[in-house]
Amino acid sequence: MDKHIVVIGAGIAGLSAASYLARNGYRVTVVEKHSLPGGLCTSWKRGGYTIDYCIHWLMGSREGTQFYSMWQELGAFTNADGSPVGIANFDQFTTIGLSNGDSLCLSSDLEQLKESLLLLAPEDAKQIGKFHRSLKRLAGAFSGNPFASLVQFFTMLGHLIPVEEYAKRFTNPRLREIFLSTLPPDWSLIALTLGLSQQPYKSAGYPIGGSLNFAMNIARKAASLGVTFRYNSPVEKVLVSEGKAVGVQLSDGQIVDADYVVSAADGHTTLYSMLSGHYVNPAYKKAYEQYPLFPSTVMVALGIKKDLQQFVHSSSPYFEESIVLCDGTSHNSFSLNVYAFDHTLAPEGCTLVTVMINTWEWEAWEKLASDNRQEYEAEKKRIAGEIIKRLEPLLGPLEGLIDMVDVSTPHSVIRYTGNWKGSFEGFAPTKATLSARLPKTLDGLSRFAMIGQWTVPGGGLPTAAKDGRDIAKMICKQDGKRFSGKG
């Protein structure tokens, strides 16, 4: 009889692993705590709108570029009715607001981007030229041969520099501000340049229908290959016998036996709860004690009874009056996304608008939601009001036009996904973390593996999906099977 593999978590890594394992002859059961697949790659419905939480740009969205064939294998680009997923590409990557009231458009055309930077800071012409050339090299490294890993490695090395250090190469204060306002100072430059570099090739677009539709497409393909999904099934612990993983126990006491267990769940929960901290090796101990994390978010979603096609899809406006959250953090900027380009997310003639504010102060939100639910809801309402007040100078008068308001917080992220500290993408992309290697297997425990954003610092959907594919290849190799991605 074929081996039975239990995959914990139906996020993109778990879905990918399940899909590739099934097409290689394994019986696969996915156990997921939520009622839907996708994990953090998700959307939800409110008042006729679909609120998208995850994808802003997706590498591999164009045929012939890296990751495209993997997404095709996974069924990500085929909708439930058999139609292809449309891809939205944009003339600009984003627009960044500056503290002096100016703004700069980061054009998707790298030549136009270069000219904009030269116009802003002619005194930095030499360094702007170097930046422009590095973007072109990075674009080429990821947009051609999907097996050019060596080229990618050496190209990326120059983009691992912390953004604070890189900004010092420029003398113009506004140009420095562009880099420093985009990323935390210790994050690697690659967090900005990778997505930006792919825009000329149209190889990092937005899949129409949003993040949950994208995840549902992958789950549907996996199910067609024979994968069994058990939703609303939180895992209490991984069962171990004689140093081997033999199954999982669910929170309701049910046992699911397995010949192999793959955890694509939150890494901290897997190591310290499901495995009771027994197999934490030095690499993971260091990671969870020292590595910085991606933040959590406060997201305000608005349904606006107006077509906002004339506004840019992505921007980070600057405000003199900061927004102060209940966690004590103060913010003069936020990420603004206008989804007028995706009519599947809003009723006809209307537009979904989302605002994201990053915060690492997750504990304050957990405490408020636990201690005083009424005050927690009042804080969400207050923040929505603050956001609307700041959006009106940008989008025009909104009175009487807002027919949906939804606010999610770090508490929401933890509640629905279980992600450690509410982080939306695991370990942050710094020079140290991106250079680190975290093992997929644990010493002293066989027939078990970990995958996903907590095993690959820097995160990202393509990385998660590739991680699932790679673990299937590893298991096939262990069992003497010839791996196939077809099916």
Language model feature labels by segment:
Residues P173-D186, G396-P457:
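A glycine-rich dinucleotide-binding beta-alpha-beta segment and adjacent secondary-structure elements
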Residues I55, Q453-I475:
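A conserved FAD-binding loop/helix module that cradles the flavin
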Residues D2-G129:
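N-terminal glycine-rich phosphate/pyrophosphate-binding loop and immediately adjacent elements
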Residues S99-L192:
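Rossmann-like flavin
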Residues Y206, E236-E348:
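Mid-domain catalytic core of redox enzymes
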Residues M1-I5, R23-N24, A432, F483-G487:
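Extreme N-terminal leader/targeting segments of oxidoreductases
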Residues K305-S408:
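C-terminal segments that line or cap access tunnels to active or ligand-binding sites in enzymes
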Residues Q198-A245:
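Helical element adjacent to the flavin cofactor pocket in flavoenzyme catalytic cores
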